[in-house]
């Protein structure tokens, strides 16, 4: 499937500063310590080619060295089934990647590995090959990221990069995640099927800018909480939301 679509607004939020809360500080132990890859899957409940890719993403999510994210898009909603997990921001993100590459390859299922390598989402061998080709000496996934929980706040720490240039610029984002979401699809190409989606991004908030130096940010837990959210991901990405580049670091953790 292939589609071209209009830009969408992103609802980023910058939240920082001490809130004066007295609480026991507990380190959130990342389930994915020192990950080597962030794998984004652009998928749709209305795409008959997507279920195999959704299954592969679920299998990749079990790998502690991989942060796998499902980003359901909305541009197939006109085909007869409105995707119940879709977000126009994910459609805009996929299109932004295509603009950065200089092509118009916007389709489902599509995987982006570490912000730079695009593949068909059902090409498991290709995805695993791209993950294996990651070289931290090039700066990709080389920045340590950690999260701590203090009462009703999440604190994010990003270490300084040893490879970033003096002109480095990127952004720090936090994602709300639902680990598994089974969906019964009533119409469209997947009518009558039940498909389970893994590590579904339910919200996406910008929390800061990055220039290669270490940084710390504090986010109210309620800003990413909603029904069904049971994990969080923080990632540092070169460029910005309209011109996304390489993934520089990330962390994933369960919230419950």
Where would I find each of the regions flagged by the language model?
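Short, conserved sequence motifs used for protein processing/export or organelle targeting and
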Residues: 82-104, 116-256
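Extracellular/secretory pathway and lumenal proteins
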Residues: 10, 14, 26, 51-54
């Amino acid at each position: 499937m292939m589609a071209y679509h209009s830009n969408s607004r992103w609802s980023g939020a910058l939240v920082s500063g001490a809130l004066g809360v007295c609480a026991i500080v507990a380190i959130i132990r990342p389930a994915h310590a020192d990950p080597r890859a962030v794998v984004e899957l652009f998928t749709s409940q209305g795409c008959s080619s997507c279920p195999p890719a959704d299954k592969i993403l679920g299998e990749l999510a079990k790998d502690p060295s991989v942060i796998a994210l499902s980003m359901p898009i909305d541009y197939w909603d006109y085909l007869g089934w409105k995707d119940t997990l879709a977000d126009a921001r994910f459609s805009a993100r996929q299109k932004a990647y295509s603009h950065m590459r200089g092509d118009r390859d916007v389709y489902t299922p599509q995987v982006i590995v570490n912000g730079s390598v695009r593949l068909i989402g059902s090409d498991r061998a290709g995805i695993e090959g791209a993950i294996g080709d990651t070289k931290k000496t090039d700066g990709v996934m080389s920045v340590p990221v950690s999260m701590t929980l203090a009462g009703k706040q999440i604190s994010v720490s990003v270490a300084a990069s040893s490879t970033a240039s003096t002109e480095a610029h990127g952004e720090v984002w936090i994602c709300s995640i639902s680990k598994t979401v089974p969906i019964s699809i009533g119409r469209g190409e997947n009518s009558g099927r039940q498909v389970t989606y893994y590590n579904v991004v339910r919200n996406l908030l910008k929390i800061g800018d990055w220039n290669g130096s270490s940084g710390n940010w504090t986010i109210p837990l309620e800003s990413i909480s909603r029904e069904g959210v049971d994990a969080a991901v923080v990632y540092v990405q070169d460029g910005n939301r309209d011109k996304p580049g390489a993934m520089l670091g990330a962390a994933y953790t369960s919230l419950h």
